[in-house]
Structure formats: C-alpha cells, structure tokens
A protein has these predicted regions:
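Nucleotide-sugar-dependent
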Residues: 241, 290-298, 306-327, 332-345
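Conserved donor-binding/catalytic core segment of Leloir-type glycosyltransferases
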Residues: 222-241, 247-250, 262
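Carbohydrate-associated surface elements
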Residues: 57, 183, 201-204
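N-terminal subdomain of nucleotide-sugar transferases
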Residues: 2-71, 76, 396, 416
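Acidic anion/phosphate-binding donor-loop and adjacent secondary structure
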Residues: 189, 195-200, 205-221, 242
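Nucleotide-activated donor-binding/catalytic signature segment of Leloir-type glycosyltransferases, i.e.
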Residues: 264-265, 270-297
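Membrane-proximal helix-turn-helix segments that form the acceptor-binding/catalytic region
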Residues: 123, 127-131, 157-179
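A short, well-ordered alpha-helix in the C-terminal region of glycosyltransferases
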Residues: 370, 377-391
Length: 416
C-alpha cells in the first residue's frame, strides 16, 4: 500500500509558482544598466516564480520567446538613437502604447513589478495592478523628474509639475518601493511615500562571472594597454556621469608617459566627449564601445584604478551601478561624487578607494597622479573590494532580498 500511495502522490500536480508580470522598456539584449540588472534578476527569480517581462522591441528578435526560464514579450516600438531627446520621447511613447494593451490582456499575475524605464511607467503599472487586483512593486533606479532638473535638462516648471503628477502618485500607491540606497530612500520618502513601504536593496555585481584577472590579459594586450597605467570609466556616457572632468584631468598629466585613460561605453554625451578630447588634445584618452559581457573580467581588470563620477547635487537621485562590477573585479575606485552619495559612502566604508569632489578636474588629476606614483596601496584596496563583493554585494544576496520582498507581497494577497 505504501508503494501505491507514493506512486499516487507523485502524480499530484505540482503547485503553481507565483506569477510575476514585469514591465520595463529595457531588457536583454540591451546594454543599459537597467537591462542587465533586470535580466539577471528575472532569470534568478525564474527558479521560484513564473516570470513574464513585457519590454520594448529589439531588432532581429521574436516578439515572444522564452529565455533562461523567463517569458519575454516584446511590443512594437521604435528603436531610435536615444541621444536625441525627441527621439527618446518617441521610443517612450510607442513602447507605452504597446505596453498598455499587452499588459491588460496578459494572464492574471500574482504580482506586478515595474522598473522605471520610462520614468513614468509606474503609472501604467498602477493601472495594470488595479485591473488584476494584485500588489504592485516598483523598483526605483532613478528619481525623476528631480534628476533631470538637477542636470538642467528640465527647465520648465510646468513640465516638472506634469511629470510629478505622472510619477509620484504611483510611488505613493505602490505596495512596496525598492530603492538602491539609503540616500535615495530619503528622497523617495520626501515625495510622500510611506517609510513602511520602502525597502533598500542595493544593486549588485556578479562575483561568479566577474572575477579579478591579471593586468596583462588578452583584452589588455589587444588594446595595447598591458604595459600602461590605466585609469578607466566603464559604463554609461551620459549627463549624470560628469566625464568632462575626467577628460580635462588628463591635461594636467601630460608628463605621465605611461598613462592611459580608457572610457568604455556609450550614451547621450559620447560624441561630445570625443569632441572635447580632440579639442583639448587629450591624447591619453581612448574612448571605446561597450565590451561583450563575456570579457568583462578582462576589461575591468585591465584598469589599475577606476573612476566613478556623478555630477554635483545628484546624490540619492541616481546611483552608478557599475561600481559593483568594479568591486567584483577587485579593482579600486576614485569616487568623484558628493560625499553623501551612495558611491562615496560605499568606497569609504569598504576602504577600496579615494574620494574627490565632483566636477573638479585638478583634484581628480591629483588623485590619478597619486595612484600612479604609488601613494595608495592599490592592491590592498582591490582585495577589500573583492572581499566586499563576495560577502555583501553579490547577485545571490540581492536576489534573496528581492525574494523576501516578494514573499511579503504574496502574503498580502489580492487588493480589495
């Protein structure tokens, strides 16, 4: 009888996994930080949840596919170059129009999860969650419209008010809002979001796939960097990163013969940065496109030290996620940010780098020269960086924190 009972038990249907409906314009194969982070998160959550992502169009990819356990649905949307504000707005609009219909006819989820691309996607997510009477989780990577105002990209008070009307109510209505730092938590609470609903989960690196390598590696040799002292920026080349200061800093270091300043990435200000380097005859600056993630360990490890910049006044409105990959690669950091920024606090806490004021090329050049001349123990800073990456900022740790938040909401059940 025991054998029969065991056989019958094995025929019982497995309990259904909770269904997540995830909304964000950017996902794999996008090179955006949010695309990479969301892809890694969703693929990890697919082990315990049924995950569907509704994202924007990608050339050459099917409208619907299953990748690493995640169902990826791509709506019809434009894919114009995002460096031009109007074209980016068209991309946003076409994606949101496709998203509304596709999300509303989706299979009923147990949870709706939204990131913040475009910044006002939370308004759509709120409507979708209400339609299915399910909890809403918003994962906040940037605080809008404040970041655009601080950068001088949004000067119209009327437009700022409109954006706040589109964005802030969804944050206040969400069952949980995940932010990526304590300073950002304060910014969000200032918008009227209940502190009880806010959770802090920093972004992460992947200590399994990104690991320290020797400076003299294949990538370094291919780019003729193996025998040079390399200062690197790897990531978005946008308005928030304040990379003008890095290019200008090199003009104070013309006497450092073996110096190379390598800027890897793309973004709205890439062409301007190339033009600035030419104008200043900053011959030590090399600007390269995004590198394949498969060789990230090599490219990041080529640097003797990395620069992570953030424009003055942006602390808590955006957090450069690339710092976690740098830590995983076991490399030190020059944080050219306000002291209250998450990056500056992290570097000071871990002891993996030095802090300089943002937007100050001379101070940045002094830190670069000191690093080159051996005034810092770069090897020890790198060891601390890697140890922190393994123990505190690895993807597995962040994913478990997200699972804890999801379990809170799953226990709350449907909205009434």
């Amino acid at each position: 009888m025991g054998g029969v009972a065991a056989a019958l038990s094995s025929l019982r249907p497995m309990p259904e996994r909770p269904r997540l409906l995830v909304l964000n314009q950017y996902y794999w194969p996008g090179v955006e930080a949010t695309a990479n982070l969301l892809t890694e998160l969703c693929e990890a959550l697919a082990a315990t949840h049924e995950v569907t992502v509704i994202t924007g169009a990608a050339r050459g990819l099917p409208r619907r596919q299953v990748r690493n356990g995640v169902t990826v649905v791509r709506v019809r949307s434009t894919t114009f170059d995002r460096s031009h504000l109007f074209r980016r707005g068209v991309n946003y609009t076409t994606y949101l129009l496709g998203l509304i219909w596709r999300a509303m006819v989706s299979k009923r989820p147990d949870l709706v999860v939204s990131m913040t691309d475009p910044p006002f996607i939370g308004s759509i997510a709120r409507v979708v969650a209400a339609r299915f009477r399910t909890p809403l989780l918003i994962i906040l990577q940037d605080v809008f419209p404040e970041i655009a105002i601080k950068l001088g990209r949004l000067k119209s008070p009327a437009a700022a008010r409109l954006l706040r009307l589109l964005i802030d109510p969804s944050l206040r209505a969400a069952d949980r809002v995940v932010v990526i730092g304590e300073t950002m938590k304060r910014r969000v609470e200032a918008k009227g979001v209940s502190p009880e609903r806010v959770r802090v989960i920093p972004n992460w690196g992947d200590a399994a796939s990104v690991a320290p390598m020797g400076h003299d590696n294949d990538w370094a040799r291919r780019h003729k960097l193996a025998k040079r002292f390399v200062v690197m920026h790897s990531g978005n080349i946008g308005h928030a990163q304040n990379l003008d200061a890095l290019v200008r800093a090199t003009t104070f270091l013309r006497d450092v013969d073996d110096l190379a300043v390598v800027i890897i990435g793309s973004g709205a200000r890439r062409s301007e940065l190339v033009a600035l380097a030419r104008l200043l005859k900053a011959d030590k600056v090399e600007i390269l496109p995004y590198q394949d993630r498969a060789i990230l360990s090599q490219s990041l490890s080529t640097a003797d030290i990395h620069v992570v910049g953030l424009a003055r006044g942006l602390a808590g409105y955006v957090v450069p996620s690339r710092v976690y990959g740098i830590l995983a690669a076991g490399r030190p950091v020059i944080a050219a940010t306000d002291p209250e920024s998450e990056t500056a606090q992290l570097v000071a806490k871990v002891g993996c780098g030095v802090l300089v004021p943002p937007g100050n090329p001379f101070a940045l050049s002094a830190a670069m020269r000191a690093a080159h001349d051996g005034e810092y123990d770069l090897a020890e800073m790198g060891r601390r960086a890697r140890a922190f990456a393994e123990s505190e900022s690895d993807r597995t740790i962040a994913v478990q924190r997200y699972r804890d938040v999801l379990h809170e909401l799953e226990g709350a059940g449907a909205r009434h």
